[in-house]
Swiss-Prot record:
GO biological processes: L-proline biosynthetic process
SUPFAM superfamilies noted in UniProt: PLP-dependent transferases
Entry's localization field: Cytoplasm
HAMAP family in UniProt: Ornith_aminotrans_3
Family membership noted in the UniProt record: Belongs to the class-III pyridoxal-phosphate-dependent aminotransferase family. OAT subfamily.
Organism listed in the record: Bradyrhizobium diazoefficiens (strain JCM 10833 / BCRC 13528 / IAM 13628 / NBRC 14792 / USDA 110)
Sites of N6-(pyridoxal phosphate)lysine modification: K256
The protein's name in its UniProt record: Ornithine aminotransferase
Cofactor (UniProt): pyridoxal 5'-phosphate
UniProt GO cellular component terms: cytoplasm
NCBIfam families (alphabetical): Orn_aminotrans
Length: 404
């Protein structure tokens, strides 16, 4: 590590709030699946900014759309119409089959917006008594870090000393349809769930789980809200992760890859029954739906489809999953994944996953640990077979080491 990097990290430590603990690398450039640090070292990005850079770093077509729009008009607020919002609505609706769109910025904003919307639907359409609406969520969830969201987290570090929290949430085990059935009451307005729990360690529910969930929600007039902010837009080898079981959510949340890493853009996708309950002045965002965001998102969606990134995620994800499972390492407890959303869970006695991520950095791989003993792997969807094979070589030599 050069003296300039040491000085840079010292400045961050001195002046920045310590709410993150990054790997000790300072990145300055990216292209496709690759990023470079300030010392000129190249790394294969196996995090993709938590799946926000699915289309690859600095995709030229998205960049061109952003630059062109930035020269024309960037922000109007929603006090006025802009010429990019309606085309954005048309294109995201056509891509996903949605009937109504609420544009926001961050993923957490989309989650908060969905919570407000389904509660309002519960009171005005379903007939739940005022202030009695209940939303069911899952243990080990991660939907964001705003106050409303961390209130129904089960992670002590995420929610500790941030209360008091808003009422109205019931927590059940993830992947347990029987628990959902038992938790539903006449006041239940929604079940908010991730198709795959990413932050928890890429936890995939049992086959058939979401088919049963869909049946239960339909039978009990409960809105199924799928948080596809990480899983959506091709990450799992399908446009939406819900498609693996052939179901359709009532409310779908998108973000991250919706703008290809260039801009914070998120969206709540639903129907008129839910989003039609919102009236002027009841919800909004100065930046949500701005012309720059819409132009960038339109380009990001186009390249995802036109360049076959979703199909590539399925193909390369299968190659990567098989290769990781073939690694014979006593340190590895389980390998799991769907598409290009994967995880290697280590035996506790193998040592902390962060140490393995630091070793991978030394071999030109950037990956992220989560929950102590799990390495998350989520490269951009543009990764090639040769790049997958090279990455597997680095994982093989690293995972066979003992950092206990």
């Amino acid at each position: 590590m050069s003296s300039s990097v040491i000085d840079y990290l010292a400045t961050e430590t001195r002046l920045g709030a310590h709410n993150y603990e990054p790997i000790g690398v300072v990145l300055s450039r990216g292209e496709g699946v690759w990023v470079w640090d300030t010392d000129g070292n190249r790394y294969l990005d196996c995090l993709s900014a938590y799946s926000a850079v699915s289309q690859g770093h600095c995709h030229p077509k998205i960049l061109a759309a952003m630059v062109e729009q930035a020269h024309r008009l960037t922000l109007t607020s929603r006090a006025f119409h802009n010429d990019q919002l309606a085309p954005f609505y048309e294109e995201i609706a056509a891509l996903t089959g949605s009937h109504k769109v609420l544009p926001m910025n961050s993923g957490a904003e989309a989650v908060e917006s969905a919570i407000k919307s389904v509660r309002k639907w519960g009171y005005e359409v379903k007939g739940v008594p005022d202030d009695q609406a209940e939303i069911i969520v899952c243990a080990d969830n991660f939907h964001g870090r705003t106050l409303g969201i961390v209130g129904f987290s089960t992670d002590p570090e995420t929610r500790g000393h941030f209360g008091p929290f808003a009422p109205g949430f019931r927590i059940i085990p993830f992947g347990d349809a029987a628990a959902l059935e038992q938790a539903i009451t006449p006041n239940t307005v929604a079940f908010l769930v991730e198709p795959i729990q990413g932050e928890a360690g890429v936890i995939i529910p049992p086959a058939g789980y979401f088919t049963k969930v869909r049946e239960l929600c339909t039978a009990n007039n409960v809105m199924l809200v799928l948080d596809e902010i990480q899983t959506g837009l091709g990450r799992t080898g399908k446009l939406l992760a819900e498609q693996h079981e052939g179901i359709e959510a009532d409310v779908t949340l998108l973000g991250k890859a919706l703008a290809g890493g260039f801009y914070p853009v998120s969206a709540v996708l639903s129907n008129n029954e839910v989003l039609g309950t919102l009236r002027p002045g009841q919800h909004g965002s100065t930046f949500g739906g701005n012309p720059l965001a819409c132009a960038v998102a339109r380009a990001a969606m186009r390249v995802l489809v036109e360049e076959g990134m979703i199909e590539n995620a399925a193909r390369q994800g299968a190659r990567l999953l098989e290769g990781l499972k073939d690694i014979r390492a006593n340190t590895v407890r389980e390998v799991r994944g769907r598409g290009l959303m994967l995880a290697v869970e280590l035996h506790p006695e193998a040592g902390r996953a962060r140490r393995y991520c630091e070793a991978l950095q030394g071999k030109g791989i950037l990956a992220k640990d989560t929950h102590g003993h799990t390495i998350r792997i989520a490269p951009p969807l543009v990764i090639t077979s040769d790049e997958v094979d090279w990455a597997l070589e680095q994982f093989a030599t690293t995972l066979t080491q003992d950092f206990s």
